[in-house]
Amino acid sequence: MKKLLLIAATSATILSSSISFAECMDNEWYLRVDAGVAMFNKEKDKTIGVKLKSNKAMPIDLGIGYYIAENVRADLTLGTTIGGKLKKSGAATNAHFTGTNVLVSHKPIVTRLLINGYVDLTSFDMFDIFVGAGVGPALVKEKISGASGLASNTTNTKNKTNVSYKLIFGTAAQVADGVKVELAYSWIDDGRTKSKHVIHEGASVQTGGMRYQSHNITVGLRFGI
């Protein structure tokens, strides 16, 4: 928790410094909302040795930002990714499960607070093209079901505080006075969940520790305030 508060405070300080610099310029605050579709990277369940695939998830972000210059802006966003799972059925290869057909799923619960910066690369009459990056704290945990959940069939890991990273490429167009719509691709690394040991057939077996990285396509709105 101390790590989470420290990173959050640092993020807020950086954003505040950027805003203080921008106050001498004739720029504006904005609110933003984003939603879309995400797919997690394939990952291996180390407990049973099965490689998992992602179904579709929904990333959602809310934020507040400031136009620092004509082609530069920064914002602070609170986001999550909901509804997605890493899952797979197949033959286990690790000890304790070798040769067993299993069905396993990992459902993450992610909450992230990111400070993001963006630069417009080109500005056309109808739209802009921009790149950006973000960093900040993320709380990550997961619900594991199936063979990897072992004796209870289902197990939950505790929240782990990670540093989340985000890379962004997108385009934006003004649709009304003070309102812009965005279409963007982003890659997010939220880090690994906690691992834990559970007892299976008299032996201590490690589960959890899944890494969550995602590819995201989102549509967003920026409202000047």
From Swiss-Prot:
Q: Does the keyword Lyase apply?
A: no
> Per the record, GO CC terms?
cell outer membrane
Entry keywords, A to Z: Signal
Report the leader peptide range: 1-22
The record, for Gene3D superfamilies, names: 2.40.160.20
Residue stretches spanning the membrane = none
Q: Which Pfam families match?
A: OmpA_membrane
Q: Which InterPro entries match?
A: OMP/PagP_b-brl, OmpA-like_TM_dom
User: Keyword Signal, does the record have it?
Assistant: yes
Which protein are we looking at? Putative adhesin RT0816
